[in-house]
Regions:
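Bacterial N-terminal signal peptides
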Residues: 7-20
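Sec/Tat signal peptide C-region and signal peptidase I cleavage site
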Residues: 20-26
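N-terminal lobe/hinge region of extracytoplasmic solute-binding protein
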Residues: 26-118, 125, 148, 221-225
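Surface-exposed binding/hinge segments that line
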Residues: 125, 159-207
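Gly/Pro-rich hinge or "lid" segments in bacterial periplasmic/extracellular proteins
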Residues: 91-103, 193-228
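Aromatic-rich, solvent-exposed beta-strand/loop patch
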Residues: 109-114, 118, 133, 138, ...
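N-terminal secretory signal peptides that target proteins for export/translocation
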Residues: 1-4
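Aromatic- and charge-enriched surface segment that lines or borders ligand/interaction sites
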Residues: 52, 77-86, 112-156, 170, ...
Length: 228
């Protein structure tokens, strides 16, 4: 689990040193952040976003106001009415945007990101310390599972990732997404927004003895990777 609250990169997360802004390594360049507009505001060694209070109290109960009701904690199925905030608060993404600069994202689950000059693909290297809430490490298999699952069960994600033709494990902690086009600088950021779901959780069985179905509604709080 990497500490984050509604997209906030906290001091707890930033304690882990980010990879260099651009670090040459063989035939790849590693980036700690990606931006469509100029250079990222924060360097590779920043401790927290300027608008974050690293000394803010931690713990307690978070209450979120919402209109209406809900009948599901499954944030990604098209069925039912999902509880407000479930997706953003329960699941971390490969990268996370800052609230004080546009079109820029920093590594969250991903330690660094790289892509060739023609942007025909993008590679994310996962942090060794990234874990789900049950202590299981976040693996490349979880990333690939999440990508394929979201495309399958949710038309919005299927459209969102329409230019992504494959997701492959390309190293012990590396996953590479290949595109059907070149030169689109936004595609790496789109993949960075991928929420990562636990494959082992959905491969397992619930208290009713049945395999958990990610397409159905559920009132059982799911296993996530975020701070709540």
């Amino acid at each position: 689990m990497i500490c984050r609250a509604t997209g906030i990169l906290t001091a707890s997360f930033a304690f882990f040193a980010l990879a260099g802004s651009v670090v040459a390594h063989a035939d790849e360049q590693r980036h700690h952040a990606l931006s469509l507009i100029g250079e990222p505001q924060y360097g590779p060694d920043f401790k927290h976003f300027d608008w974050v209070n690293p000394d803010a109290p931690k713990g307690g109960t978070l209450r979120i106001a919402a209109l209406g009701s809900f009948d599901s904690f499954n944030a990604y199925s098209i069925k039912g009415e999902v509880a407000n905030g479930v997706g953003a608060l329960l699941y971390d993404t490969l990268m996370d945007g800052s609230l004080d600069e546009p079109s820029t994202a920093y590594g969250l689950i991903a330690e660094w990101v790289s892509h060739p000059d023609d942007i025909s693909s993008v590679t994310f290297k996962l942090r060794d310390e990234a874990k789900f809430q049950d202590g299981e490490p976040i693996k490349v298999e979880d990333v690939i599972f999440s990508f394929k699952l979201l495309k399958k069960i949710n038309p919005s994600y299927n459209k969102y990732y329409k230019n992504v033709v494959s997701a492959e494990k390309t190293g012990d902690r590396k996953v590479t997404f290949s595109f059907d086009m070149k030169g689109n600088r936004e595609l790496p950021l789109i993949l960075g927004d991928l929420p990562v779901l636990p494959k082992h959780y959905y491969d397992g069985k619930g208290k009713n003895g049945k395999v958990r179905d990610p397409e159905k509604t559920t009132m059982t709080p799911p296993l996530g990777s975020g701070p709540y």
